C-alpha cells in the first residue's frame, strides 16, 4: 500500500481592510509554517490577521493570493524561505484582475497617488440594469451617503461583485476600461468594492486615472 501524505497546515497573512490575502508594495503575499511567526508578522505590518490553511498552500490558496494582486508568494519556515512566482496558468480557472487589486491594496496602505494613476491600465466591473420597456434605458447602481451625495458602484473583480450581488438582484456585471468608467462616473465618482476595501474614487481621482490613459494613447 502507498503512503498517505498528510497535508501540512500553513498560516496565510490576510488584510483586515480587503479581507483578502495581504500583499506588500512589491506584490508579495506571505505564508508561514508557524502560527506564532505569522501572528508576529501580521502585527508588524498592521491591519492584518492570520488564517489557517489546513491543506497548506494548495492551488486554491495560491489562486486567492494571485487574485488579490500578488505576483509572488513567500513561504517562511523557521530561518528558511521559498519564493513562488504566481501566474494564472496552473491556478484555479476563474476571472482574475490582479493588477487592479494590487493597486487598490497598495494605495490604501500608502496613500501614494501613483497607484491611482496606475489604474488607467485596468479593467473594472460595474453593475448595470437594462430595460427595454417602454424604451431602452441603462441604469448603473449607486450608493447614497448620509449627506445625500451618491456614488456609482464599481468592483475590482467578480468575487467582490458577487458579495454585493447576493443581496441585490436584477443587476448584471459589465466590464469596462477606464474610459468607460470615466464616462459613467465623471460627475459623481465611484465607491469601489463596497463589501471589501470601500475605496472612494473621487472625481479628481478619476481625472487622474483618465489622464494616464490619454497620455499612454498619445
Protein language model annotation of sequence segments:
Residues 1-218:
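An interfacial alpha-helical scaffold signature
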Amino acid at each position: 500500500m502507498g503512503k498517505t501524505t498528510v497535508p501540512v497546515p500553513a498560516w496565510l497573512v490576510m488584510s483586515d481592510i480587503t479581507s483578502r490575502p495581504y500583499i506588500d508594495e512589491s506584490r508579495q503575499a506571505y505564508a508561514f509554517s508557524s502560527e506564532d511567526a505569522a501572528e508576529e508578522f501580521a502585527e508588524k505590518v498592521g491591519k492584518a490577521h492570520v488564517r489557517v490553511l489546513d491543506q497548506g498552500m494548495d492551488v486554491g490558496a495560491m489562486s486567492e493570493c494571485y487574485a488579490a494582486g500578488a505576483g509572488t508568494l513567500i513561504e517562511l519556515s523557521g530561518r528558511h524561505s521559498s519564493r513562488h512566482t504566481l501566474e494564472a496558468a496552473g491556478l484555479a480557472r476563474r476571472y482574475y484582475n490582479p493588477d487592479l487589486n494590487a493597486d487598490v491594496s497598495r494605495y490604501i496602505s500608502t496613500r501614494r497617488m501613483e497607484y491611482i494613476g496606475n489604474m488607467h491600465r485596468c479593467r473594472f466591473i460595474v453593475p448595470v440594469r437594462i430595460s427595454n420597456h417602454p424604451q431602452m434605458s441603462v441604469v448603473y447602481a449607486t450608493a447614497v451617503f448620509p449627506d445625500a451625495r451618491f456614488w456609482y458602484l464599481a468592483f475590482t473583480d467578480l468575487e467582490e461583485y458577487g458579495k454585493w450581488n447576493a443581496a441585490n438582484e436584477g443587476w448584471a456585471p459589465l466590464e469596462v476600461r477606464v474610459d468607460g468608467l470615466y464616462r459613467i462616473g465623471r460627475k459623481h465618482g465611484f465607491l469601489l468594492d463596497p463589501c471589501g476595501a470601500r475605496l472612494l474614487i473621487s472625481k479628481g481621482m478619476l481625472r487622474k486615472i483618465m489622464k494616464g490613459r490619454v497620455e499612454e494613447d498619445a
